[in-house]
Amino acid sequence: SSRVYMKSAILERDEKQFDAALRLIEAGLKSYPKSPKLYMMGGQICSDSLPKEKANLERARKFYQRGLQQCPNNAVLWTLASRLEERASTFDSARSADAASGATKARSLLELARLKNPKSPELWLEAIRLERRNGNQKLAESLMAKALQENPSSGALLAESILTAPR
């Protein structure tokens, strides 16, 4: 099962054998292309464990893009892909740290995710937090209002709304 590939890749990753882990993930994806965790692991290994180089950023992007094509309803996959885009500027030392560009790409990715999964409170919450991390308080409040209209019974959104409400 895909779980065997995943656990084997985790073992290789823990042993710092990143190439072996990625080979196992690719082999697992050939047999189980609808397994979102394998795409997540591939993207995370490329973005977090390998050196912060442009080639590894592209490898991580490809894992997430392939995963989103196969599993478009997986909120965690969308979230990881948007976070990768948000911090993409840390991968390119030749370019000045352009966080605004990363936030723009992350924002558009989350917008697409919410169009495909409008009833996913996790995606709304990630979009709200992205705006807060980038200092767009008004936009975050506007998104929160829309999110609560779309998902009125979401405990996570209600909790976030209460925690971030002005006192």
Question: Which role does the model predict for each range below?
Answer:
Residues 1-167:
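Alpha-helical solenoid scaffolds in eukaryotic macromolecular assemblies
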